Amino acid sequence: AAVTSRTLALAGESWWEQPEHLARFEARMDRKTVTTGCGQGTIYSDLMATVRSDAESLGSFNEASISKSQIHRVIAQARNHQAVYQEAGGVHACALADNKPGSDGGFLYFVEDVGRHNAVDAITGWMSMEAQGPEDKIFYTTGRLTSEMVIKCAQMGIAILLSRSGITAMGYELAQELGICLIGRCQGKHFLVYSHPERVDFES
């Protein structure tokens, strides 16, 4: 293998050559992204640069907003749809809700699954198969709003995320950077807006 550098260990009075594949490994480590989902997944790519570029190019981010009454309607819809959870528990739910002006917040697609990432990926697949754009859409999940959830929704082009659960610090930081509104602890008439509150109309 081609030699790219030499390292000297003074204590042992020895040196060794660093082959090219180790240099490539170090380059990959420089691009490492550690996410905050289950098990802290690690991605070795320029993922964040791609996500930022995607978010900036999506017009759906620019005007996205939601009213307080619409948040309440989405929460009520979610409670009524979770048949498997109410029967047996042990599953997560994700939904894509209509956020067009004058809509009732009805669910365009709803899925329950033992894995929250399986559920969000099902939403992504449905949008692709049905040629559904991200405009006037709300994403709802029962799972935590982690960095992975924020990244996936940014790639979908959805700027408003609701969750029955809370958020993580990295999820919050990414949402702040990308312009995504995170709304957590959605139960009954209660919710907490964690990021970009300017996207929420609290008067209607």
Please state what every model-predicted region is.
Residues 1-93, 97-104, 108-110:
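Intrinsically disordered, low-complexity regions enriched in acidic/Ser/Thr/Pro/Gln residues
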Residues 5-7, 116-193, 199-202:
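Feature captures the catalytic cores and cofactor-binding loops of soluble hydro-lyases/lyases
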Residues 111-115:
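Short beta->alpha transition motifs characteristic of CBS
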